[in-house]
């Protein structure tokens, strides 16, 4: 019987085969006509890839049936090189969460009176709730730059 083999280029090859022929025999005949080695050939019929050991009758391939020839691709994607960094990785700053951080701004004395530990900035541009930093010799506002310097007892 006669079957057709359609290649990727669109070229159609006619082969003279028997229904008892194996897929290996068909691939060998394609190699004789086209020069494509059998290990690179994939034959597809009715959406299924044909296995080498089976016969044409196993797949119900009759006279004047068309098989599609596809080339087998070996391997996968190219392996990527691992990146090498010239500088060591920068350590990111992590915010330290302090529970009840507001308590460091106030002190409660024995009688229950609340006393403010840090001075609040009197500047209009800062607004209420902006505290000044306490240094050993001054109070400093980081927002507006206002500075109050302490007088030493021996300077008076």
Curated annotation (Swiss-Prot):
Which Cys-Cys disulphide bridges does the record give?
none
Q: Does the keyword Cytoplasm apply?
A: yes
Q: Where is the Ubiquitin-like domain?
A: 1-76
Renumbered to this chain, where is the cross-link Glycyl lysine isopeptide (Gly-Lys) (interchain with K-? in acceptor proteins)? 76
Which residues belong to zinc fingers classed as C4-type? 121-144
Keyword Cell division listed? The answer is no
According to the UniProt entry, its GO molecular function terms are:
mRNA binding; structural constituent of ribosome; zinc ion binding
Any one GO BP annotation for this protein: translation
Q: Which SMART domains match?
A: Ribosomal_S27 (SM01402), UBQ (SM00213)
An example of a Gene Ontology cellular component annotation for this protein is: cytosolic small ribosomal subunit
Q: Which UniProt keywords apply?
A: Cytoplasm, Isopeptide bond, Metal-binding, Nucleus, Ribonucleoprotein, Ribosomal protein, Zinc, Zinc-finger
- What's this protein's family per the entry? In the N-terminal section; belongs to the ubiquitin family. In the C-terminal section; belongs to the eukaryotic ribosomal protein eS31 family.
Q: What else is known?
A: Ubiquitin is encoded by 16 different genes. Ubiquitin is generally synthesized as a polyubiquitin precursor with tandem head to tail repeats. Often, there are one to three additional amino acids after the last repeat, removed in the mature protein. Alternatively, ubiquitin extension protein is synthesized as a single copy of ubiquitin fused to a ribosomal protein (either eL40 or eS31) or to a ubiquitin-related protein (either RUB1 or RUB2). Following translation, extension protein is cleaved from ubiquitin.
Q: What is this protein called?
A: Ubiquitin-ribosomal protein eS31z fusion protein
Q: What is the lineage of its organism?
A: Eukaryota, Viridiplantae, Streptophyta, Embryophyta, Tracheophyta
Gene name for this UniProt entry: RPS27AA
């Amino acid at each position: 019987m006669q079957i057709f083999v359609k290649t990727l280029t669109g070229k159609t090859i006619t082969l003279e085969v028997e229904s008892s022929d194996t897929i290996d025999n068909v691939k060998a005949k394609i190699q004789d006509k086209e020069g494509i080695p059998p290990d690179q050939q994939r034959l597809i019929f009715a959406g299924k890839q044909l296995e080498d050991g089976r016969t044409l009758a196993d797949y119900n391939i009759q006279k004047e049936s068309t098989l599609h020839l596809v080339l087998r691709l070996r391997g996968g994607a190219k392996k990527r090189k691992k990146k090498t960094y010239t500088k060591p990785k920068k350590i990111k700053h992590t915010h330290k969460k302090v529970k009840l951080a507001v308590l460091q701004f106030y002190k409660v004395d024995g009688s229950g009176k609340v006393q403010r530990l840090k001075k609040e900035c009197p500047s209009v541009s800062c607004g209420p709730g902006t505290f000044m930093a306490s240094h050993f010799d001054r109070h400093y506002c980081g927002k507006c730059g206002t500075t109050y310097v302490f007088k030493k007892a021996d300077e008076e």
